Regions:
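A general structural motif
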Residues: 99-102, 221-237, 254-262, 281-289
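Conserved thiamine diphosphate
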Residues: 102-152, 176
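Single conserved hydrophobic/aromatic residue that forms the stacking wall/gate
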Residues: 306-318
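Redox- and metal-dependent alpha/beta enzyme cores, enriched for Fe-S-associated oxidoreductases
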Residues: 242, 246-274, 287-294
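Conformationally flexible catalytic loops at phosphate/diphosphate-handling active centers
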Residues: 31-35, 146-241
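Thiamine diphosphate
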Residues: 1-111, 116, 133, 153
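Glycine-rich beta-alpha junction loops
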Residues: 93-94, 150-157, 256-258
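Short, solvent-exposed amphipathic alpha-helical segments in soluble enzyme
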Residues: 20-22, 77-79, 136-138, 163-166, ...
C-alpha cells in the first residue's frame, strides 16, 4: 500500500489507526516509502479517494464495515469496471436497519456481491496475516479489486499470538512486473488516455462482457499465491479447505470465524465415530464450482450451510 484513504467506523477503525500511526512514525512499506494516509469526510469520500488515487498509479487501500461499505458501492462498480487493483479490508458487520447493531455478520459484504470485486475471507487473526498478501498480489496480477473480509469483533478484535510476515518475504512474493504495468497504465499527460467515457448500447454490452475472461482466470491466480504462501509458511491454504473424516456423509459448508468452532465439534464427533466434515470457504467471489467439487467427499449425502445459507446456496446449486 502506498496510499490509505480512511474514515473511521466500528469495528474497522483500529486498522486505519495502526496505518496512521505507522505512517506518522515513518515506517516504510516494501517499496521503501511511507504510506500516505488521507482521512476523508465520509466513507463515500474515502472510496472516491481510492478511485482517484488508483487512477494516477498509486497502490491504494481502505478499511471499512457495515453502512460505511455500502456508501462505497458506487465507486466500487467504477473501480472494478476499470480493472483497478486494490484491496478493501472489511471487518464484516451487521448492516443497521430497525436498530443499530455493531456486531459481526456478512450482510454488508453480501451487498457487494454484484459490484465486480473479488471476495476473500479469513477465519482468524493468523489467517488474516497469512492471506491478506494473497489479496494484494492476486489483485495486481489479476487486474481485479479485492474485498478482503473477516468477522467484525470476533476476528477483528481477537487477541491472539501470531507469526508475522517478514518484509523480504512479502517483497519476494509481490509481482513487481504487475506493479510496473499498473503504474504504466496510470493517467499521465505524457501519454493521455480517456477514462469513464460514454458508450452507447452498440459497444457497452460487449465491453462489459469482455471482462468475464478476467474473472474466469482469477481463481487460478488466487490459488497460485496461496501456494506461494503455503511454500513459505508450511500451510495448506486453498480456495476451499476440507476438514474432517475422509468418508464423511454429513458436511458443513461455512465461512468466517465459525470455522474454528466447527473444527472442534468435528474433532469431538469423529472421535465418537461419526462421519462428518467441514468445507471452509476462502474465495467467495469469483466462486469456483470446480474447486469446491474437488473437496466435497464422494461419500457425502447431506450438505449444510452455516451463516451463509441464502447467497451461498444459490452458488452451490448453480
Amino acid at each position: 500500500t502506498e496510499v490509505a484513504a480512511i474514515y473511521p467506523i466500528t469495528p474497522s477503525s483500529p486498522m486505519a489507526d495502526y496505518v496512521d500511526q505507522w505512517s506518522a512514525a515513518g515506517r516504510k512499506n516494501i517499496f521503501g516509502s511511507t504510506v500516505k494516509v488521507v482521512e476523508m469526510e465520509s466513507e463515500a469520500g474515502a472510496a472516491g479517494t481510492v478511485h482517484g488515487s488508483l487512477g494516477v498509479g498509486a497502490l491504494t487501500t481502505t478499511f471499512t464495515a457495515s453502512q460505511g461499505l455500502l456508501l462505497m458501492i458506487p465507486n466500487m462498480y467504477k473501480i472494478a469496471g476499470e480493472q483497478l487493483p486494490c484491496v478493501f479490508d472489511v471487518s464484516a458487520r451487521t448492516v443497521s436497519s430497525h436498530a443499530l447493531n455493531i456486531f459481526g455478520d456478512h450482510s454488508d459484504v453480501y451487498a457487494c456481491r454484484q459490484t465486480g470485486f473479488a471476495m476473500l475471507c479469513e477465519t482468524n487473526p493468523q489467517e488474516v496475516m497469512d492471506l491478506s498478501p494473497v489479496a494484494h498480489c492476486a489483485a495486481l496480477e489479476g487486474k481485479t479489486p479485492f474485498l478482503n473480509f473477516f468477522d467484525g469483533f470476533r476476528t477483528s478484535h481477537e487477541i491472539q499470538k501470531i507469526e508475522e510476515w517478514d518484509y523480504e518475504d512479502l517483497k519476494d512474493m509481490c509481482p513487481m512486473d504487475a506493479v510496473e504495468e499498473f503504474r504504466a497504465h496510470a493517467l499521465n499527460p505524457n501519454h493521455p488516455s480517456a477514462r469513464g467515457s460514454h458508450e452507447n448500447g452498440d459497444i457497452f454490452f460487449q465491453h462489459r462482457e469482455a471482462c468475464n475472461s478476467v474473472y474466469d482466470a482469477l481463481p487460478a491466480v488466487v490459488e497460485k499465491y496461496m501456494n506461494k504462501v503455503n511454500e513459505k509458511l508450511g500451510t495448506n491454504y486453498g480456495l476451499f479447505n476440507y476438514y474432517g473424516a475422509p468418508d464423511a456423509e454429513r458436511v458443513i459448508i461455512a465461512m468466517g470465524s465459525v470455522n474454528d468452532v466447527v473444527e472442534e465439534v468435528i474433532d469431538y464427533l469423529t472421535a465418537k465415530g461419526e462421519k462428518v466434515g467441514l468445507i471452509k470457504v476462502r474465495l467467495y467471489r469469483p466462486w469456483s464450482s470446480e474447486a469446491i467439487l474437488k473437496v466435497i467427499p464422494k461419500t457425502a449425502k447431506k450438505l449444510s450451510l452455516i451463516h451463509i445459507s441464502e447467497p451461498t446456496r444459490l452458488q452451490l446449486i448453480s
